[in-house]
C-alpha cells in the first residue's frame, strides 16, 4: 500500500478537519521524516478526512493514470497525517466511527467492520437493552443490561462509544467496576457487577432468546412484544409452581406512566392468592379488587383459558413464573389454603400470618395463637402466640398485607410465604433504583411502608442482653423442622419495630427470601432467596459447631470442625504436577487452589507459584532428615508434601486448615513471629521455611567483584529509576542490576526467584514491567564461554563502561574477543574505558570456540507473584503456549461474614498471551486501565518472577 507521512507535528495549521472518516483496508508502512523510523499504521485504523487550506481540498491530483490520494489524520496517532490511495480506504459514517473507535485492537475492529449486520445492530443498543457480554475470549457470554452508552473520555475530535453493562445471573461478581470510571459515576450497580466494553464484546439479545426483558426492560425498550388486551370477565389461568391456578379478568390495561411496559392484567383468583387492592401509584384502576384474592401481573404471564389446553402457556414467558417467587422448584407440591368460609371472607382472613421476609412486604400486629410464621420463630418454649411481632402504631391498617400461597417445603405450621411477583430491585437507566414491572403492583400496596429510599444501612450494635453471644459473622441456626442454617450478616432494629432482628444469609436458597433487603431497605447483600430476617432471640449458635461457639480467635477457629465443608485430602503418593489440558481441568474453578484465611494470601500465593505447575523445588519435599535438622523438620516436610503439594496437584484444592498448620510451625522458629495472624512478605516466609526449618541448599550463589561467593534464595533488584525507560523487561532489569553492582552467578541456578525493584509494597519503580518468558543468563555467569558482541566468536574481555553505549548492541552486556575489543576501544570516546578479562574455564582452548556455536544458558518463566494494596495473587504457566496462564486468588470470594470462609479461585487468563506479544513501545503507550482481564495485574503489580532451568533442574 502506497502512502506518505506528511508530518508528526500538529496539523491544525495547514489543514481544515472535516467530520468525514475513513477506515484503512490495508496496512500502511511509512517513515517518520524526523526520526527516520518506520511506522506501521495497521489495517483497521481510522482516519479523519483533512482539507488543504491552500488548495481547498485534500484529494491530491496524481500522475496521469493514477488514482487520487486522500489526506487523513489517523485518530489513534493524532499528530500523523497520511496520504493514501482511494482504493485502500473506505468511507464510514460518524456513528459507525464512534462504535469502531472504542475497539483498540485494529484487527478485531476490522473484523467487526466486515460484519455489517452486527455493526448495524450496534446502533440499536441503548440504555436498557438486554445483551450478552464476552468478558474473555473462549469463555461463555454473560447476560447483562446496558446501563450506560457513550464516550469514557471526551478528549478527541471524535470519541469511541463504550457500553457500561450491569452483569446479571451467573455474571454477577465477574466484572470490575460498580459503574465508576476514573472517579466519575457513569452508572450504578453492585461492586464487581459492571463492565465497560466496546461493541465487539457485546451481543444484542433478540426476542427469541431473551430471558431478561420482562424484569429488565428499559423505558424505551423496543423488544417488548405486547399481547392484545384480554376481555373483562374472560377466564384465565397462571402457573403457580407445578400447578395451574384459575381466575377471572377484572382489569386489563397499561399502567399510568408505565405505558412502555405493555399491558398488565388484574385477575380475581378462584383461590385466595392475591396482593392487589386495585390501585397503582395512588390511582384507583379497578373497583372490584379484593386484596386477598386479586393479583396484578404482566400479560405475558397470563394463560388465556380458551380451551382444554389451558395447561399450555400462550407463549413462553420472558421469565418463568417460578423465578418471580411464587414457589420453589425444589418443592414437590404446593398446598393451597382451603376456601372455607373463614378464609374466603376478607373480614376473617388472618392478617398476622405474614410478617415480611421480602423487600416491600408488610407486618400486622394481630397475633394468632395457631399461626406461627417462619419469620418469627422464637425460643422453643415460647408461647406461639407471642411469636408474632408488634408494629408501630403509625402503621396504616387500611393497607392489607400480601398473602401469597404457602410452600410445603417447610413444616405444616410454619410455612414460608412466597410472593407471586418479583421484588428484585434494578437500577433504572439514570442509575436510580427502580422496580421491575411485576414489582410495581406490590409497590402500590406498600406505598405507606416504603417511603424510605433503598440504601445500604449500617449495622446496629447488638443489645448487651443477648445471652448466646451471637454477633455479625456468627454461624447461627433458626429452630425449624428442618432448621435453617446461615451466617448473621446484620443485627439491628428497623424503623417502626420494637424487636431486634437478625439478618441471616442462609446456606441454601429458600422461597420467599430476599437478597438482603427488608421492607424496601437494604441491610446487606447476598444471593437472591438467601436473606432471612428473624427475631434475634429466635437464633441459636449453629449446633453443628457447638464446641466453637462463640468464636473470636481466628487462629483457633481454623480447624477441621469449623471448616468441615472445606476440608481437603491427604495424599501420601508423590505426585508430579499435571501440565497442559490435564492440569487445566484439575485446577480451574471456584474452591480451587489454596484457601486463604486470616492474612494468609502472601503464603498461599507463594506456595501456589512454587508447586502448582513446577517440580523444580520438589527435592525440598524428599530430602531425608539429617542429624542437624530441627526437631520439626519431618513434620514440616510431611505436611508440605502430603497435605499441601500433592493434594494441590491431584485435586486442585488445599484447605486453609493445612496452611494454618504450617503457619504454626513457622511460629516455632525463634527469629519468627506473627506468622499465624499478621501480613508478611513472601521473602520473609521463604527465608524462615527454607533456611531455618528445611535447610534447603541456597538456590543462588552470587559473587561480587571477585569477592567471596554469597548464598541466597532469591535476588532483589536494586537500581535507580531510569526515566528514559518506559517498560523494562526482566532481562534488562537483571542485567542492569548485575552490571551496576558488578555481580556474577558463581553457578548456573536451577531456580531463580527475582524480586522486582520497588520501595516497600506500595511504591513501584516502574508502572509496568514486561515479564520475559525466557531469561538468558549466559552473560551473567562466571567461568562460562560467552559470545563476542560483534563477531560472535569467543569473548575474552568485558567492558562495563560500554554497556550504555547505544552504538554497539544497545541494551546488551558488552563483551568482545581480542580483535574486536581493540577495534572498539580505538574510538576516541572509548579510549579511557577500563575493561576486564572474561572469566573462562582454565582448560578451554581459544580455538575450540572460535568458529563454534557457544551454548546459551536459558531459564523459563513459570510463575509471577503479584501484589496490589497488600493482597498477594499469583499467575502461573500451565503449558508451553504463551497464552497458557492461570490466575489464582486465595480470597476471591467469601462465604459468610466475619466468621465466614474465603473461597479460593483459579481462572484461565489467555488474554495475557496477547499482551506479551506486544512491543514495549505499544505496551508503554497503553493506558493501564484499558488492559483487559487479569493481565493488568501481571504487567503492573509484579512482585516476584520465578524462573526455572529445564536442564539444571535435572542436576540440582
From Swiss-Prot:
The modification Phosphoserine is found at residues 387, 418, 422. Disulfide bonds: none annotated. GO terms for molecular function: cysteine-type deubiquitinase activity; K63-linked deubiquitinase activity; zinc ion binding. Residues 330-349 have a biased composition (Polar residues). Residues 153-198, 253-286, 492-535 form the CAP-Gly domain. Residues 781-833 are annotated as: B-box. PROSITE patterns: CAP_GLY_1, CAP_GLY_2, USP_1, USP_3. Residues 106-593 are annotated as: Interaction with TRIP. Zn(2+) 2 binds at residues 799, 802, 825, 833. It catalyses: Thiol-dependent hydrolysis of ester, thioester, amide, peptide and isopeptide bonds formed by the C-terminal Gly of ubiquitin (a 76-residue protein attached to proteins as an intracellular targeting signal). Pfam families: CAP_GLY, CYLD_phos_site, UCH. The keyword Ribonucleoprotein does not apply. Residues 470-684 are annotated as: Interaction with IKBKG/NEMO. It is a peripheral membrane protein. Residues 592-950 form the USP domain. Residues 394-469 are annotated as: Interaction with TRAF2. The keyword ATP-binding does not apply. Deubiquitinase that specifically cleaves 'Lys-63'- and linear 'Met-1'-linked polyubiquitin chains and is involved in NF-kappa-B activation and TNF-alpha-induced necroptosis. Negatively regulates NF-kappa-B activation by deubiquitinating upstream signaling factors. Contributes to the regulation of cell survival, proliferation and differentiation via its effects on NF-kappa-B activation. Negative regulator of Wnt signaling. Inhibits HDAC6 and thereby promotes acetylation of alpha-tubulin and stabilization of microtubules. PANTHER family: 40S RIBOSOMAL PROTEIN S3A (PTHR11830). Interacts (via CAP-Gly domain) with IKBKG/NEMO (via proline-rich C-terminal region). Interacts with TRAF2 and TRIP. Interacts with PLK1, DVL1, DVL3, MAVS, TBK1, IKKE and RIGI. Interacts (via CAP-Gly domain) with microtubules. Interacts with HDAC6 and BCL3. Interacts with MAP3K7. Identified in a complex with TRAF6 and SQSTM1. Interacts with OPTN and SQSTM1. Interacts with CEP350. Interacts with RNF31; the interaction is indirect and is mediated via SPATA2. Belongs to the peptidase C19 family. This is Ubiquitin carboxyl-terminal hydrolase CYLD. It comes from Pongo abelii (Sumatran orangutan). The lineage of its organism: Eukaryota, Metazoa, Chordata, Craniata, Vertebrata. The gene is CYLD.
